[in-house]
Amino acid sequence: MIKIKKGLDLPIAGAPAQVIEDGKPVTQVALIGFDYNGMKPTMEVKVGDRVKCGQLLFTDKKTEGVRYTSPASGVVSAVNRGERRVFQSIVIDIEGDDSEQFAQFSPEELPNLSREQVVENLVGSGEWTALRTRPYSKAPAIDAEPHSIFVTAMDSHPLSADPAVIINEAKADFKNGLVVLGKLTRGKVFVCARAGVNYDLPSGSNAVQEQFDGPHPAGLAGTHIHYLDPVNASKFVWTIGYQDVIAIGRLFTSGRKSVERVVALAGPMVSKPRLLRTRTGASLAQLTEGELKSSDVRLISGSVLGGRNAKGNVSFLGRFANQISCLEEGYKREFMGWLSPGSNKYSLLNIYLSKLNPGKLFNFTTTTNGSERAMVPVGSYEKVMPLDILPTQLLRSLVVGDTEMAQKLGCLELDEEDLSLCTFVCPGKYEYGPILRDSLTRIEKEG
């Protein structure tokens, strides 16, 4: 077991009850372009076309052969683009339950499949896009082979669902998915779990379980990779979420694309925080109808630390999101707030009275408590960074655009979510995730 000491478990109110209930039916789903870094689509459908679940919607110009398929049966109602025609989302009005049929195998046949059979089925169904490379966090090339694969079977995000609850409902599918993933690498398939949790892994496979303990980010793939199989510019690993492993297991044994997704609906503004069974790309406005304490709420697809503001053309559940976080919009300004003793405010530093009550939970809002200012190194980053890197120096290199120094300091190991705590504790209010993404894009482009 690997124990993480540095990090931060955000004391936020509204944690979900770990009980799965059926969510409200939704009539719209969408595939969000921002979920796929560096992807440039070539559309194969247009508004008004009828599609089946699993049918091809578009391919990626930059990664040849990678297919993005429909998460529902219905009619394409919108293809949304932003400035400079950047692809935002493709929306489907759900009608019927028609599905494309893919290759189907019995569980006994899975260990004997070839790598080519596995790749063909994953690519054809669109489940290939559940895999992400590290470095760069992109859909892998079809002919690529990773040094190892990391299954994130734990979640340390604030307000997250317990993966064990979801996996225990689909043990057979999870095992079948691990068998399939094992065909993609000659290395190990690391199943990373919370301390004290033991999953039933398939015998005779290359799947091994590793346990992590400690505060967030103990549950992030970047942390697991750093300690178990570090990457560099010429060494790649792949990551995948536990619910996508279940979906892959179902795909290979049923021949149909699985779009079920269990998410945590949680946060200070949720009337009844709990786990909901819904579908990939579900409309969050429809899913959360009647669930919120007020209308002035920001819906976040994903974690409060690194999720996406779900509004407008992207008001849908993200491809890799396992939670819906709901926070009150922080419009209100507090007169002379910097002079208050802060009994109801939280800070990592010992500057508020609330530190005298360490078990207190807070109703966080979206306010940043101030405007952007200079980056001040007061030791906050070091307190929340468990990786063996120099966070202040790395962040400074990213901010000034020194990609050469950033590579030397370890930026290739990181994804946006790995710097989300640094963003939260930053006195200068910097958003380090987008800054890291810009640097990674430049590094990949320039070599």
UniProtKB/Swiss-Prot annotation:
Family membership: Belongs to the NqrA family.
EC number: 7.2.1.1
Highest taxon in the source lineage: Bacteria
Alphabetical list of NCBIfam families matching this protein: nqrA, PRK05352.1-2
Keywords per UniProt: Ion transport, NAD, Sodium, Sodium transport, Translocase, Transport, Ubiquinone
Class in the EC hierarchy, top level: translocase
Molecular function via GO: oxidoreductase activity, acting on NAD(P)H, quinone or similar compound as acceptor
Function comment: NQR complex catalyzes the reduction of ubiquinone-1 to ubiquinol by two successive reactions, coupled with the transport of Na(+) ions from the cytoplasm to the periplasm. NqrA to NqrE are probably involved in the second step, the conversion of ubisemiquinone to ubiquinol.
Protein name listed in UniProt: Na(+)-translocating NADH-quinone reductase subunit A
Transmembrane portions of the chain: none
Keyword Transport carried by entry: yes
GO BP terms, alphabetized: sodium ion transport
Catalytic activity, as annotated: a ubiquinone + n Na(+)(in) + NADH + H(+) = a ubiquinol + n Na(+)(out) + NAD(+)
Subunit organization: Composed of six subunits; NqrA, NqrB, NqrC, NqrD, NqrE and NqrF.
Matches recorded under InterPro entries: NqrA, NQRA_2nd, NqrA_C_domain, NQRA_N
